[in-house]
């Protein structure tokens, strides 16, 4: 479980996250939506402990957080396999290459090649493969559906359902309403750093209509 209390993030005079509070429970998938610049990525980095912030984030004891950012980054001369092994060692996970290769059968990544030379779609799949192998208790994913193909989307959706069934806590963001509306237990909408709407239990069509009417309508 993660309990967030009054989380605020400012860059000088600019308030990016404004007094955000929420409790994220195990065994649930949470969706966060919002326009570009609404504060989703900053919020995720704060909860994951990557950025400093004002407020409180309480993580249940002995729970490991896995974080997948929206922009892949890999060092120039590190292969896909070396990247995975480095990330696993950083988490204290002992996963053999046979297991890595077995899971990679779904992604068909050339793990012997330098990851920095992968296409954008391949880089995203490598991020996802690495996160899957880490077996974290709490999973934070920033725009995981961006840049992946149909097969990757299907694999990701199946995996999210498996994580929920295993009692993991998953927090993700997406602009693709149809990709998350039937997976997420709760969906919140952030506008200018504040939660302004709760779409939990609503259909994808209803969510899209609400967003268009309330937030994306042209200014008269």
Language-model regions, residue ranges each:
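Helix N-cap at the start of a conserved alpha-helix in ABC-type nucleotide-binding domains
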Residues: 150-152
């Amino acid at each position: 479980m993660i309990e967030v209390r009054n989380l605020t993030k400012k860059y000088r005079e600019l308030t990016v996250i404004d007094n955000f509070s929420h409790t994220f429970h195990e065994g649930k998938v949470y969706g966060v939506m919002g326009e570009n610049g609404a504060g989703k990525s900053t919020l995720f980095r704060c909860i994951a402990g990557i950025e400093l912030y004002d407020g409180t984030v309480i993580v249940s004891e002995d729970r490991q957080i896995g974080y997948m950012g929206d922009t892949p980054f890999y060092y120039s001369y590190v292969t896909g396999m070396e990247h995975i092994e480095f990330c696993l060692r950083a988490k204290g996970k002992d996963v053999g290459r046979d297991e890595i290769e077995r899971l990679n059968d779904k992604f068909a990544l050339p793990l012997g090649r330098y990851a920095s030379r992968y296409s954008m779609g391949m880089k995203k799949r490598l991020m996802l493969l690495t996160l899957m192998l880490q077996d974290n208790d709490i999973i934070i994913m920033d725009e995981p559906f961006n840049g992946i193909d149909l097969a990757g989307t299907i694999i990701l959706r199946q995996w999210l359902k498996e994580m929920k069934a295993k009692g993991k806590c998953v927090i993700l963001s997406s602009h693709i309403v149809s990709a998350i509306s039937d997976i997420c237990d709760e969906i919140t909408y952030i506008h200018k750093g504040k939660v302004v709407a709760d779409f939990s239990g609503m259909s994808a069509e209803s969510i899209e209509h609400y967003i268009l009417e309330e937030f994306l309508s042209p200014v008269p």
